[in-house]
Amino acid sequence: MTVSREELATKVDVIDWLTLRGHLERGGLVVVDPLLELAEVGAALAADDVKAVERWLSSGLLGKPSLAQVKEWDVDKAKAFLCLIVSPYVLIQEQTRVAG
């Protein structure tokens, strides 16, 4: 069964780092660069689009959280992320803070 990008877009939610931390422990977190849309990446994973996923991985637009990122996020456990679950993965994207 193929899940559409539009359908996945309705499933994107906001979640804090403290809640996501457990998914890091089991290895399910995948960081998505802000240049990509979570729903687009989720649809590619769900469709097993190996070419797109490999392209994003090789260009650094998609990957596991780095140790530096985890340390930074552990300091601010309330940090907000956009999140999309595409089992077994939890796709996350840092929310940018708007100055105001």
Please provide the spans of the model-predicted regions.
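Generic secondary-structure microfeatures
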Residues: 34-36, 57-61, 88-90
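Short, hydrophobic/π-rich interface segment
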Residues: 40-73
